[in-house]
Every structure is written in structure tokens, then in C-alpha cells.
Amino acid sequence: MDQARDDIWAIEHRHSVRRFTGEAVPADVRAELERAVAAANATSGLHMQLTWDEPEAFKTMLAHYGKFQNACNYLALVGPKGPDLDEPCGYFGEKIVLLAQRLGLNSCWVGGTFSRKRTRCDVGAGEKGGR
């Protein structure tokens, strides 16, 4: 029941943030998020990837238009190509977003205001990014 209560708290307190402090995410927080992504990937068959300290993906005109500032950490939602990819990406991606909120990190879902070519994520043959 504590997990459900924690999730409700995170849902109530979560809001989109586009301006970040630029401070490094603490190692223990990174490790907990990495563990959660690995567990979600094992359960879902996705290939989600966390990238740390990489500002290039958000150095675009669209990111400037979207008012992103100091965005250099991100979760790439990647999985097997197919018509049903968006559902697991949304479900498991939101689980990671809520964990990040509980760990004191704000976030924002991003669709088209970043450069796919500039990301450090690995999209293999037969995979694509979720929307």
C-alpha cells in the first residue's frame, strides 16, 4: 500500500518543468532510476535508455521555442517497431517519471522539440522511439 500512496503523492505533485537548474543529478538518484529502467525493460521488452549530462539533444530551434533550459538528462523511450509501441512506452515511461518525481526530480514529456540525431540513445534494427 505504501507504493500506491507514493504514486498518488507523485501524481498530485508532478507538473511539467522545462527549465532546469543545471545541477548534476546525485549518483544515488541516478542509480535508482537506472535500476528502475532496467527492471521496466526486462518486464516490457522495451529498450528505454537514460542519458546523463548530454545537452546536445536540446540544442535546436524547436527546443528554444519550447523554452527548454539546461535540459541535459533524458529518458529515451525505444522499443520494437509495431503498432502497439506507444502504449508500453507511455505506461512504463510514466512509471519512471513518477519515480523521478518521488526522488525530487522534475520532468517534462517531450515529443518534437529535440533532435533525434543528436541524442546518445541506441535505436537498433527493428526498433524505433515511442511517441
Residues covered by each model-derived region:
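Acidic, surface-exposed loops and disordered segments
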Residues: 1-131
